[in-house]
C-alpha cells in the first residue's frame, strides 16, 4: 500500500519494539502515521536489520510497543 502521497500522513520518528508470533522480538521504528476512513490507524513500520524496507500496516499495540523517542 502506498500511503506516502495520501493527505493526512504524519511523518514521525518513533522507536518501537516489534513482537513476533514465535515469541521473538526486534527493534524497529515508525516513520509515519495515517488513519483510514473507518478510523483504523496505520503505521509505516521498519524492523531493524530485517533487510526489508518500511511498509504500511495496521497499528497493533499488542504487537508494536512504542518506546521513548527522547529523554528519560
Task: List the predicted regions and their residue ranges.
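Basic/aromatic-rich interaction segments and small domains that mediate binding to polyanionic partners
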Residues: 3-5, 10-23, 31-62
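Acidic, negatively charged sequence signal
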Residues: 7, 67-72
